[in-house]
Amino acid sequence: VDFLTALVTAGAAGGALGLIRWGDVKRHVDWELMTVLVSALGFSLALMRSGAPDQALAWLQASTGDLSAITWLVMLFVATTIATNALSNIAALAILFPMVAAMVNGGVLPSQVAFLGLAFGASNAFLTPFGYQTNLLVYGPGGYKSLDYLRMGIGLTFLYGAIVLIYLQFLLP
């Protein structure tokens, strides 16, 4: 049984047995976040079905020649870091997931390394106030400016990136 089916079944059973009330669900579920997640997944699925990530990967491989796995990993991590700081971590994941799937299917990177690189890159949101929800949460009340995030986040971004890439390098075959 897949996870979604089990989750829906457990929720329905909890509702039928009176363990879960609809009012509690409405109050405790972040519906805005759920909307963003579902939209991002829909976008990601449409992108994968279009074949664009496979074409982009083929173009990249033809343009760059034979690159090592660590080079592909660094490119993935940097692209995800830029996307997560420019958009948000969820948007970065949704946009780059199809490309990572194409990289895995094309034999460029092993799946574990590729998806960890994507996840860690999407968490590297230290440069802007809108890259991650917590950054935005303290932005206004703390009286910070965007330049403060850039100034304080640049060192963290490089340190975090170095640690992640060194770690992931050991997972490469």
Label each region the model flagged.
Residues 1-6, 86-88, 108-111, 173:
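Transmembrane helix interruption/hinge and helix-loop junction motifs
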Residues 10, 15, 21-106:
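Membrane-embedded alpha-helical segments and adjacent helix-loop junctions characteristic
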Residues 16, 46, 103, 162, ...:
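Hydrophobic membrane-targeting alpha-helices
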